[in-house]
Amino acid sequence: MTKQPNSNMDARISSTGCQESLPRTELDSHANMVVLGSECFVFDNILDQTCDVEPFDPTIGTAKRVPIVDAALAYDCPYSHKTYIFVLRNALYIPSMSHNLLPPFILREAGIKCDDVPKIHCKNPSIENHSISFPDSELRIPLMLNGIFSYFHTRKPTNEEIMSCDK
């Protein structure tokens, strides 16, 4: 039995020439918290907690009262054609952003292997390089580059996916 891509994968395949317009999650080694944009499913605004966020340049100003949320992202694996749901807790929510920021440090603290060195900088690159892998799963997420930023495509999951997909 041959697995067929789901509708989200079909859309991604048909839009190969316009990769930049697809929602994505970027690795950000300077962030100390996960930052989620508009393409996530917020399932809990933690007791209406907020915080003020200082940017890398103090002259830009502080983002005031940024909500802290629990939310989910969907990842459509191009190899298995399965959709995985990533649950992110205590994340900053900035809905004006079209992408998400994920600190590799936080992935590593959770026991997830994050190799953020691009393959062009590896002596003998393999599938393990420039990827995110999970110790208790066969899932491996290959990373891509947008300029110098490593990223992978994610999107807002549907209600049905929240209930039925692997987390």
Question: Residue ranges of each PLM-predicted region?
Answer:
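Intrinsically disordered, low-complexity interaction arms of viral/retroelements
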Residues: 1-21, 27, 147-167
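Residue-level signal for well-ordered alpha-helical segments
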Residues: 2-8, 12, 52, 78-84
